[in-house]
Amino acid sequence: MSGTGCFPAGEMAAVARVCRDGAAAARLKTGSLLAILVASAVGICLPVALTGAFRGKAGYARGLLLVKCYAAGVILSTSLVHVLPDAHAALADCAVATRRPWRDFPFAGLFSLVGALLALLVDLSASSHLEAHGHHQHAEEGESPPPPPPTHQPYAPIPTTKKSPVFELSGEMSPKKRAHSDDTDRDDVALFGAKSAVRSDEVVVAPRVGCHGHHDVVEVGEEGGGGEEEEARRKQKMVSKVLEIGIVFHSVIIGVTMGMSQDVCAIRPLVVALSFHQVFEGMGLGGCIAQAGFGIATVGYMCVMFSVTTPLGILLGMAIFHMTGYDDSSPNALIIEGLLGSLSSGILVYMALVDLISLDFFHNKMMSSSNKLKKVSYVALVLGSASMSILALWA
């Protein structure tokens, strides 16, 4: 897929004579269109179909989390083991590396960094847009804005929970209970932020002290749950969309590069490897789409887009070659391939580490409540990374 490297002139000529066969390459690429299309469709539709079949059943949430962790490993391995090394090899080819400025600076790493920063910018912009849209929607529905932070009052309510230590008549806890409560709250705040000091399964009971000394008990534990859940769903939808952009971008590069190639020795194993590649990558994207809760039309559109992108890229590459006689081993072709591949790698690394692995392992209530689930999820992450990395032996 990338440059051939610095080989002696005689060896390079012999390899070129044996492997470069335009007619055989065209037949292989034409046959690969259906295989890659089916593999892509199976990979992305399988998690979506299983989600529809098992939604609401016992173990569904944990199963979906494991699929997502496996998917994160696949995407991380795709970016670091497949995309970035190919991009670096293209820019390190003798036809490119002997020219300036390509020999003076590691452009593969630079553009990978640019890709990650661009993904962060898109993430921040989308988050700000969703936040503003949410406030605007609340205003249209006539809902009151969130209350301002409470100020100090001499008779402020004392929030307690049904599981909290019992207050003595004096309003203070015993030293032993106070130390235990302080340690627990401190750990919760350190791990999950200030809002997590009260667990989601607890109902906050706030004794509202009135002017006449009586107490009105108000339960407020369930008020903010719907808004937080809706915000999490919006975030997941945004993650899925940005992730699909990065994967589709990468798939176009793969398809166009393969379509322009006339090297039969490279195309033959590449067809098999790309088929497995699309299955695993599709499972990764499909798991994220399934968790985001899109409508049927949006899910169908995203599945179709992923399925047809690589075959369309192959057709585009074949068309470019036949119309222009474009040489896939020319310096300009290698530079374009290397820069676009590096950019795509940075996007995928950011999405895997920040929007998938970090969210699941450090900000997921279900994950934080079970050490066994953490271990199994980590194993799923490693298996996803390993399954995709093994394919680097052939592609």
Swiss-Prot record:
Compartment(s): Cell membrane
Extracellular side: 55-63, 126-241, 291-300, 355-374
Family to which the UniProt record says this protein belongs: Belongs to the ZIP transporter (TC 2.A.5) family.
Region span, Disordered: 132-163
Gene that encodes the chain: ZIP6
Basic and acidic residues composition-biased segments: 132-141
An example Gene Ontology molecular-function term: zinc ion transmembrane transporter activity
Function text: Zinc transporter that may be involved in zinc uptake from the rhizosphere.
Disulfide bonds, paired cysteine numbers: none
Domain of life, source organism: Eukaryota
Protein name (record): Zinc transporter 6
Membrane-spanning residues: 34-54, 64-84, 105-125, 242-262, 270-290, 301-321, 334-354, 375-395
Organism of derivation: Oryza sativa subsp. japonica
Any single GO CC term annotated in Swiss-Prot or TrEMBL for this entry: plasma membrane
Topology versus the membrane: Multi-pass membrane protein
Keywords, sorted A to Z: Cell membrane, Ion transport, Membrane, Signal, Transmembrane, Transmembrane helix, Transport, Zinc, Zinc transport
Cytoplasmic side: 85-104, 263-269, 322-333
GO terms classed as biological process: zinc ion transmembrane transport
NCBIfam families per the UniProt record, alphabetical: zip (TIGR00820)
